[in-house]
Amino acid sequence: MDYYQWRKKNRRRKRNLQTKKPLNYALKLLKYRVRFEDELRERLKKQGFADEEVESTINTLKKQGYLDDEKAAYLFALDEMRLKLFGPRVVRMKLKSLGVDEEIIERAIEKALEEIDFHEELKRLKGRFKDRWELRDYLYRRGFDPSLIEEILNKIDGGEE
């Protein structure tokens, strides 16, 4: 084995040792996107780390501010509502399926609803539909509450006149 092969082999071994640590693996996962506590716990356990190591890693990340379910839920709700135009009902179901606490979900959705202006988004969308009923059905399927749909449609219709 020549020097270059030996060096390559040692680099690979060193890299494997570094990624075997649960904290390094968790930080690697968090580098790509914000994750929820339960989601990260499952990923670490699936990787084969012991329960004590997983809990210690999660506590460390919480203390350092890398892991915050409330912030993650808010960012998730904001993205789903703003970019994918999902309503609160669908966002609530998605967050529940990710294992987020009910109180955190409600606060995140309220905060996201305060920040988003659906009226401008839906004004552009209105041209795709023949009439008001089609748009109403579309919004209901996307997870908007009937009262919110009526409020939005009234503002859109009021703004055109």
UniProtKB/Swiss-Prot annotation:
Cleavable signal peptide: none
GO CC annotation: cytoplasm
Compartments in which it is found: Cytoplasm
Keyword Cytoplasm: yes
Matches recorded under InterPro entries: RecX_HTH_1st, RecX_HTH_2nd, Regulatory_RecX, WH-like_DNA-bd_sf
Alphabetical keyword list: Cytoplasm
The organism's place on the tree of life at top rank: Bacteria
Alphabetical list of Pfam families matching this protein: RecX_HTH1, RecX_HTH2
GO biological process: regulation of DNA repair
Family classification: Belongs to the RecX family.
Function: Modulates RecA activity.
Descriptive protein name: Regulatory protein RecX
